[in-house]
Amino acid sequence: MNIVHLTASTFYGGPERQILGLCRALADGDRSTVLSFSEGGRCAAFLAEARRQGFEAAAVEHDTPRVRAAVADVAAELERRRADVLLCNGYKANLLGRLAARRVGVPAVAVSRGWTGENVRVRLYETIDRMHLRWMDRIVCVSEGQARKVRRTGARPERVRVICNAIDVERFGDADPTYRATLLRYFPKPPRRIVGAAGRLSPEKGFDVLVAAAERVVKRDPAVGFVVFGEGACRGRLERQIAKSGLGGSFRLAGFRSDLDRFLPYFDLLTLPSFTEGMPNVVLEAFAAGVAVVSTAVGGAPEVVEDGVSGFLVRAGDAAALADRIGEALASEERLHDMGRQGRRRVERRFTFAAQAREYRRLFAELTSAPVETGKEDLVTAESCEH
C-alpha cells in the first residue's frame, strides 16, 4: 500500500519524529512518502532526515495564500505516488490535503496531535481546523484526551480513532556520560539533582508555573537545579521571572538542542508543567530513558503517567502542588529509580511503533477494503492507553 504523509514542517521535532517512526514501522509491507509544504525553506531539515532514513521526500512547491496551486501540487504528488491513503499532519495539511485528496479520489486522514492556542494567529488557524475536521474521512487522535476535544467539534464519533504516539526505546540504549557533565556546566555551581524540562517557550507550556515551583523547591533544597531545553516567544519574560525569583544560578534556559534525547538519561527527574497537550512525546522519551516524571494531568499525560507508580500528576497551574510533588519524588533515590523503571516498562508494553503501525494498517484496511494482518502484541488504542 502507498501511504503519503503530508505536513508543514519548520524543523525536525516531535511530530516529525512520530511521522518517521511510523514510516519505519510500516516499511515491511507498505511504501511511505513524505511531503511537506516549504514553509520558506524551513522544511529542508525534516526532508533531509526522511531521505537519510531511506524514504522518498519532497517539498510542495506552492503554499498559502496560493491555495489552488498548492492543492494542485499535492494532488499531482498523490497521483504520481499512486497514493492509497493520505495522512495529514497539522491544520494546513488537513485543509489543503483534504481538497487535494478529494480531487484524485484518495481517502484523507487527519492526525490530530493537539491544539496549542499559543498566539492569535495560531488560534485562528486552529479554529478553522476544528470546523474543518468533520469533513475528513477519518481523524486519528494521539490520546483519548485529544479525542474528547475532537468529538466536541462535531466530528462524527465513528470517524474518530485513538492511536497514541509511540517511542523507539532503543534510541535510549547507549548513554554517554559526557552529557551529564554538559548538564552540570549549565550551572555556576553544579547541583546535586537536576530537574529537566523541554518544550517550546510559549504560554501553554506553563514554564512560568515551573519557575514559581522551582523557587519553592530551591528554598527547601538549594542543591536542586532546573534546566529547560527549548526556544520561543516567552524566553525574555521567563528570564526576567527567573532573575526576580533569585534563581539565576539554579534555573537555566538551555535553548533548543537537537540531541535532547542524549541528555534525558541524565535528568534525575523530568517535569511537564503544560496547560494543554495532545500526547506529550517528551514524557514517552523520559520513560524510555528510565527517568521518572512529574506532569500536569492534561491531555494524554494521564494515559502515560501512572500517578504514584511511574511519577506524579498535578493540576495544571498549581505551582505549590508541582513543587511538593517534585520534592517528594526527589526525596528518595530508590523510589525515583523505581518510578523510572516502571515508566520504561510501560512504554515498552504500550507505546511501540510496531503496535502503532498495526493499528494504522487496520485503519487503512477500513478505508480501502484491503486485507490486514493481526498481531499478538499490545495495540496502541484508546483501551491500551488508559490501562
Feature map (PLM): residue ranges:
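Conserved acidic donor-binding segment of nucleotide-sugar-dependent glycosyltransferases
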Residues: 307-308, 312-319, 328-334
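Carbohydrate-associated surface elements
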Residues: 145, 166
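A short helix/loop element that forms part of the nucleotide-sugar donor recognition site in Leloir-type
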Residues: 47-48, 173-189, 359
